[in-house]
Amino acid sequence: MRLILLGPPGAGKGTQAASIVEKYHIPHISTGDIFRYNIKQGTELGKKAKSYMDQGLLVPDEVVVEIVEDRLKKEDCENGFLLDGFPRTVVQAEALDKALVDMNISLDKVINIQVDKERLIERAVGRRICRECGATFHVQYNPSTKGALCDQCGGELYQRDDDNEETVTRRIEVYLSETTPLVEYYSSQNKLVTIDGDKKINEVFANIVTSLGSDL
């Protein structure tokens, strides 16, 4: 199963990604992770990417595609993969399509998790994180039974500085402006499946599995 996962910040993408890779026995490929890996290992691609980042420049699409393509050629991707965080633009999507053709493979589906903007803001603004163990809670949907302390370790819960309405709204708007053309691109290829992310976690996953033509 060769998949791409799309979804705005706060849509629960990370949770669903973990379930998808476990069910289909495929690697979860996050562009952030493979960038960090290549830079840490000092690979040629890592050095190339770092040279742009050190200057405060965006890494060009061709370098990003090269790094992703290199990762997709690894042995653990033989039975598929879940791409997360790439592509972000139609130009990157076209470059990825070309790279996949060169590798004699193609995408199966692009999963687009949708949640209303108001609900995304509500989710982010109510999020609380433990300073000690990193556990995540929500004041409304998943509160700690210990109030301002973590259920798991008793650590202090705090709200991230960027989990405020203004910043979250801006993040969502940037995401939508980038991703709307991408959604249209994959829709025109009949590869897009849109999933309502405003349901219980297990319901969202069940809908993803059904959309991929599988059984739970």
Swiss-Prot record:
A GO molecular-function annotation: adenylate kinase activity
Catalytic activity: AMP + ATP = 2 ADP
A cellular component term, taken from the record's GO annotations: cytoplasm
Entry-linked InterPro entries: Adenyl_kin_sub, Adenylat/UMP-CMP_kin, Adenylat_kinase_CS, Adenylate_kinase_lid-dom, P-loop_NTPase
Pathway in which this enzyme or protein is active: Purine metabolism; AMP biosynthesis via salvage pathway; AMP from ADP: step 1/1
Pfam families, alphabetized: ADK (PF00406), ADK_lid (PF05191)
Source taxon at top rank: Bacteria
UniProt xrefs under Gene3D superfamilies: P-loop containing nucleotide triphosphate hydrolases (3.40.50.300)
Ranges in a coiled coil: none
Region listing for LID, in residue ranges: 126-163
Positions that bind ATP: G10, A11, G12, K13, G14, T15, R127, T136, F137, K199
Region (NMP): 30-59
Keywords assigned by UniProt, alphabetized: ATP-binding, Cytoplasm, Kinase, Metal-binding, Nucleotide biosynthesis, Nucleotide-binding, Transferase, Zinc
Annotated positions binding Zn(2+): C130, C133, C150, C153
EC code(s) of this entry: 2.7.4.3
Keyword DNA damage: no
CDD domains: ADK
Record keyword Disulfide bond present: no
Subcellular localization(s) per the UniProt record: Cytoplasm
Residues the entry annotates as binding AMP: T31, R36, L57, L58, V59, G85, F86, P87, R88, Q92, R160, R171
One GO process term, biological-process aspect: AMP salvage
General function of this protein: Catalyzes the reversible transfer of the terminal phosphate group between ATP and AMP. Plays an important role in cellular energy homeostasis and in adenine nucleotide metabolism.
Family, per entry: Belongs to the adenylate kinase family.
Notes on the domains: Consists of three domains, a large central CORE domain and two small peripheral domains, NMPbind and LID, which undergo movements during catalysis. The LID domain closes over the site of phosphoryl transfer upon ATP binding. Assembling and dissambling the active center during each catalytic cycle provides an effective means to prevent ATP hydrolysis. Some bacteria have evolved a zinc-coordinating structure that stabilizes the LID domain.
Quaternary structure, from the entry: Monomer.
Protein name: Adenylate kinase
Organism phylogeny: Bacteria, Bacillati, Bacillota, Clostridia, Peptostreptococcales
Gene: adk
